Design a protein with these regions (language model features):
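Ligand-recognition elements built from short beta-strands and adjacent flexible loops
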Residues: 481, 523-529, 533-536, 543-643
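Hydrophobic alpha-helical transmembrane signal-anchor segments
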Residues: 1-28
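Beta-lactam-recognizing serine transpeptidase/beta-lactamase-like catalytic domain environment
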Residues: 54, 59, 198-210, 247-286, ...
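Conserved, well-ordered alpha-helix/loop/beta-strand core segments that scaffold catalytic motifs
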Residues: 203-247
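Short, small/polar residue-rich loop motifs at catalytic or cofactor-binding pockets
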Residues: 42-46, 243-247, 427, 615, ...
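Short extracytoplasmic/periplasmic juxtamembrane "stem" segments immediately C-terminal to an N-terminal membrane anchor
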Residues: 30-48
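A short, polar/charged loop-to-alpha-helix boundary motif
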Residues: 67-82, 267-280
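Small/polar-residue-rich segments within soluble enzyme cores
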Residues: 84, 104-215, 523, 540
């Protein structure tokens, strides 16, 4: 009887403990158990794309895939069959090595083996499809996704786009300036795992994505790829022809400050050498600076449209003598002839009419001595010398573009102020930013920083610079039917011991149309060998770029784009379903592309995956082959017609 009581009490104790554990402490123990086997894994996000204004993708994150295995889950009886499957899809696959590694890891009870093969999308999908057909092979084989930054046609854009560091962060150019916008937000997958030493996301059970991965935003630039290639090629040819130290150029919209093209030579051999010279390299501009001196004198009222300046060809300033470059600028010169023939003495005389403080003030007003604020990394600037140090000699030198250093972009923006109805605008490279669904989340707009010169002063200077092209030092820039304004510049380079004989910066600035300027360009060649005058060295590539611009855009002499453009139609389909189009491409299904623009097409079209494609025309998609819904693969020939 005693034993029965003991057994009965034992059962009561067990039941009481079970009740305590399961009912009273049940939730607590369940949570503890879940915590023991709960795992979270990061889902990588893609960095945003960088796209030109005409729709060419310059930078994007491409997907590659690693094969990873859990050797303990692979059935030894099926290993040969698995090796055969992988060999049929990976040409360089080493069957004996991989088989040996799997068996060795399995004996060691190792849960993770990454094969040394990087797969593209089609290879990965083919293997996945075959594994799905044979369930006996699928166990223990997984894929890990990697993102690699790809740059397309990088040579012409390298110094503008920049590059990333090993942590996928921008360290130069637009990649750095807009790093926060381009960087996505990684997601998190949570689930329960079976007990094992190594866990992958593929071994999780009851998974859920508790934080969705959000890809980075896409940047649409002001740059036009055709104009960028044109400018870049002209700089290359000039750089090589004159065996120069460097060459740089910028093409911009006058009224808006949009940069349409910006490039330089020589090109960097590696990331450490990347340098955006138009915003980093300082130079003395020489005679291209003279319109600023004349505009300042007119604005201050020390000269007017009727002013005539007398020159004997030389002038003494303190203990220095300033000479004209030749006899064409001696005698009595109107302001128009002074600019057209590029006289130095006349500029000194105009500067002497101004109070030093006033002259200095206008140097600041046109943006010299401070950065332009362009939206890219590494812009430099040299401060103006202190006002107290502005001697008569220094003021006289600056009047004709010597003794003052600036970047090419600073010089262009200052000259642009003179021709742009007196308005100093802020230059920019990014037009707008779009999110993953194609919604514009930020739109840059033209910014007028200051109204520096009156309309009358600007108009007079535009016509003075037109005379440079019609009868002065820049006559080679004439384009039949178009009113071009310009200014040549040849500046002797300064060194440690003063100005260096035989070393020059050769420049040419131009704009059109004269009455209401739309486009402006500045090209500068550093130390050309052979010829060195701006009219001989820098003018020809400027003219070539303008000729290409006029033809490409269909621009009439008034600066209006006359080529009939397809009117932009707001189509709910393209705004709502660009993401779906991208997904259908990803799933090897031809989407319905009708109605979307070339820019949108290029933003979602996977060029590397479907490389056999042809796009015809511009505007919006009108016809496509294959038809929507057709299965496609890497060998499919795709043709898109736009109007």
């Amino acid at each position: 009887m005693f034993i029965v009581i003991i057994i009965f009490l034992g059962f009561l104790w067990i039941i009481a403990n079970l009740f305590y554990i399961q009912i009273i402490k049940g939730d607590e123990w369940q949570k503890a158990g879940e915590m023991q086997y709960k795992s979270e894994f990061t889902v990588k996000s893609k960095r945003g794309k960088i796209i030109t204004n005409d729709g060419e993708v310059l930078a994007y994150d491409g997907e590659t895939y690693d094969i990873v295995m859990d050797p303990t889950l692979i059935d030894p009886e099926n290993i040969d069959k698995l090796m055969e499957l992988l060999k049929s899809n990976i040409s360089s696959f080493d069957v004996s090595k991989v088989k040996r590694d799997i068996l060795e890891k399995s004996r060691q009870n190792k849960k993770y083996l990454k094969l040394e093969y990087i797969l593209g999308y089609n290879e990965k999908k083919n293997i996945q499809d075959e594994l799905s057909k044979d369930k006996s092979l699928k166990s223990g084989v997984f894929f890990e996704t990697n993102y690699t930054r790809n740059y397309i046609k990088n040579s012409a854009f390298q110094e503008l786009i920049g590059y990333l560091d090993v942590d996928n962060k921008g360290v130069y150019g637009i990649e750095k300036t807009y790093n926060d916008q381009l960087t996505g937000v990684d997601g998190v997958i949570e689930g329960f795992r079976i007990p094992r030493k190594f866990t992958t996301v593929y071994s999780l059970k009851e998974t859920k994505e508790i934080v969705l991965a959000k890809n980075g935003n896409d940047l649409f630039l002001t740059l036009d790829s055709v104009l960028q290639y044109t400018l870049d090629d002209e700089l290359r040819k000039t750089f090589e022809q004159y065996d120069a130290v460097s060459a740089m150029g910028i093409l911009m919209e006058v009224e808006t400050g949009k940069i349409l093209a910006m490039s330089s030579y020589p090109k960097a051999k590696n990331n450490a050498e990347v340098k955006n010279r138009p915003i980093t390299d300082l130079f003395e501009p020489g005679s291209i600076f003279k319109p600023i001196t004349v505009a300042t004198g007119l604005q201050l009222g020390v000269i007017n449209r009727n002013t005539v300046v007398a020159s004997t060809g030389h002038i003494k300033v303190a203990d220095r003598v300033v000479n004209d470059h030749d006899g064409s600028t001696t005698g009595s010169l109107t302001l128009e002839n002074l600019i057209a023939k590029s006289g130095n003495v006349g500029m000194v005389k105009i500067a002497q009419m101004m109070k030093t403080r006033d002259f200095y003030s206008y140097l600041e007003k046109v943006g010299l001595g401070k950065k332009t604020g362009i939206d890219t990394y590494s812009e430099t600037s040299q401060k103006l010398l202190p006002l107290k140090d502005m001697t008569e000699v220094k003021k006289s030198n600056i009047a004709f573009g010597q003794g003052i250093a600036m970047t090419q972009l600073q010089m262009l923006m200052a000259l642009n102020t003179v021709i742009n109805h007196g308005k100093l605008v802020k230059p920019y490279l990014v037009d707008h930013i779009e999110d993953n669904d194609g919604n514009v989340i930020h739109q840059n707009a033209p910014i007028v920083l200051e109204k520096v010169f009156s309309e009358e002063v600007s108009k007079l200077n535009r016509h003075y610079m037109e005379a440079v092209v019609t009868k002065g030092t820049g006559q080679g820039a004439q384009i039949l039917g178009y009113n071009i304004g310009g200014k040549t510049g040849t500046a002797q380079k300064s060194g440690y011991k003063g100005y260096e004989k035989g070393k020059y910066f050769s420049s040419f600035f131009a704009f059109f149309p004269v009455e209401n300027p739309k486009y402006a360009i500045l090209i500068t060649i550093n130390e050309p060998h052979g010829a060195y005058y701006g009219a001989a060295v820098a003018l020809p590539p400027v003219k070539s770029v303008f000729e290409k611009l006029i033809k490409y855009k269909g621009i009439n002499p008034q600066g209006i784009i006359t080529e009939k453009k397809q009117q932009s139609v707001i189509n709910p389909y393209q705004k709502k379903d660009l993401k779906r189009i991208a997904e259908e491409f990803e799933n090897e299904l031809m989407p319905d592309l009708k109605g979307i623009s070339l820019r949108e097409l290029l933003a979602v079209y996977p060029q590397r995956k479907y490389s056999k494609y042809k796009f015809v025309g511009s505007g919006q998609v009108k016809e496509q082959w294959p038809l929507p819904g057709t299965r496609i693969n890497k060998d499919t020939e795709i043709k898109i017609v736009l109007e």
